[in-house]
Each structure stands twice: as C-alpha cells, then as structure tokens.
Amino acid sequence: MKKEVWRDVILSSVAFLALMWVAFFWAQKYFPMEQDTSAVAKVEEKKVAYLTFDDGPSKHTQEILDILEAYHVKATFFVTGSNPEYYDLIQKEDALGHAIGIHTFSHDYGKIYSSEKAYFEDVDKTNALIEKQTGHKVNILRFPGGTSNTVSRKYSSGIMSTLASAVTKKGYAYYDWNASNGDGNCYVGSDTLINTALKEIRDKKEVMILMHDG
C-alpha cells in the first residue's frame, strides 16, 4: 500500500474516533490485559464501540498507537508474525493498555485452513510470540477472513465450523466484526473510509469495527 494512501487510512481512523467521542458521546470499551473473555460487556442506554486492528504489527502501527494515545482510546490488536522487525510493538501495545489477540502467525489461508492441526500449530506459534513480547499468553483470537469466510472451503470443507468449535473447547474466545471502514481497499480515500464506517455503524448499539494496521 502506498505511503500516502496509508496516511489517509490512519487519518480516517482519527476522524472516526473523534466522531465517536465528540459528536456522539459514545462509550468505548475494550478487552483488558488479562484477556477476560467476559470483557464484551453491555452498557445500558449507550452505544459501545470496540476498535480492532488486524494484520500488524507493521511500520504503520506506531502512528496508530500515537493517535489512540492522543485520544485516550484503547483498542484490540489481532497480531500476526509477518513483520519480525516490528515485534517490539506488541510489547508496546500491551504496555499502553491495549489488548492483544491472535490473528495467526502466517495469515496464509492455504496453510492455516488446510486442517485443524495446521491451524493450531500456527495459533500456538503466534501465542508464543505474544508471550515472548508481553510475558503472558492470550485467549482471544480472530480468524483471518472471519468465521463466515468462504475462501477456506477451497482448502478443507467445513473447516470453519470445526475450528470455531475447537478453539472454544481449548478456552479461546473468537471475535468477528459487524462493521468495517473498508481500509482493506488501498485505492480509496479518507472521506470514503469515514463514510463507510459511519454507514456501517448506523443503527447498531454495539459495534465491533474492523480496521487494519498491517
């Protein structure tokens, strides 16, 4: 993704946060560092937004952390092992009070969705990385593509149902999303990203919004 486009993505995230906190007075909740799976709590008569970032850490993560810090906002980062030079940012995310979740080490659909064994080998590798950086393992995760993705069918029929059940039995809580700002498309500007986010959160009392830092 071109640097200037990523800058738009980051700025759109700032605008989104400002809109939530200033214009709508939303209450933002997040997963605590202890990774308590009961953290997704209802807040009566208030809208709740859970800000989540996938695919990092990367060269863009530090700027996102700076923005979140400026607005006193916490988020959840579902990390991968794709960029070893930025592993230290996992420790920084944790130290700043953000939550860390597993998004798989490789993010390789053909590999992780080929079998249950392959998926958990990748998950374990990611959790080992998180433990090395933060001193503790985590028990929250997000499947690449989400639980309803259809790409996985090419590699193993019914694998998502199998994995959703298996991760629960192993004590993990998995989280999809019900809104996105569309930043997976690197050819859209910040205005489009903001409008997409606002459209998707409309009429939702509890929002789990998907964004990317990698």
Each predicted region: which residue ranges?
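Terminal accessory/targeting
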Residues: 1-50, 66-75, 178, 191, ...
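Intrinsically disordered, low-complexity segments enriched in small/polar residues
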Residues: 28, 48, 96, 153, ...
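Active-site beta->alpha N-cap acidic-glycine motif
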Residues: 30-140
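Catalytic domains of cell-wall/extracellular-matrix polysaccharide-remodeling enzymes
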Residues: 85, 107-214
